[in-house]
Amino acid sequence: GSREVVQSGSTQSFYEFVEVAGGISWTAARTAAETKTFAGVNGYLATITSASENAFVASRIPNADNVWIGASDSTLEGDWRWGTGPEGQNGGTRFWYSEDGVVNGVQKNTSYSPPAQDQDCVATAAESVADGNPIRGSIDNNLVTYACWAPNEPNNFGSGEDAVVTNWSNSDGKWNDLPVTYSANIDGYVVEYSEWNGQTFSSSNVVKSSSSVSMGGPVLTA
């Protein structure tokens, strides 16, 4: 069948939503994403590192709930990292640290559940403390990068939740942590294609920031 692969003008990456009837686990989605190709470039579960990128991805999956993206804290509980694509190199890029405690005199976090007054989508840890609560999402006084958790997430509920979905429970662009083996109510996953690790888009039809290109099906840019 046809594919819809859409380019973001801000990241220059291409994105593809893969719907999976009956659900799919994060582990299986990660493997599946890395077997997909577009214009000669291998895919990976999307890494969302800015508000504009998050909004773009959310705009492409408005009718989908619980869609896997490339974040995990499977190595160290509460140490959330992008573990796929270019951000997944060298142990992954940390974007959030959500474990209680103090490191070198700096309060890392009050709890997994952020105070109701705090923003859930933050670009830096400083943005989450307008109400005077201790900084959450920081370690060794290094600010977090972008994150957009749903209220009271991540919470590592039950037996452990080490992977992330976007569009959690009808909340467009909001993230939640779930077990890596969870597949019920998962609508699919988002694949990102970008030029990294020596890979370049091979097709002359792929023109960055163009209005549209075609690769065996409808392929749009925005």
Language model feature labels by segment:
Residues 1-222:
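Extracellular, disulfide-bonded carbohydrate-recognition/adhesion ectodomains
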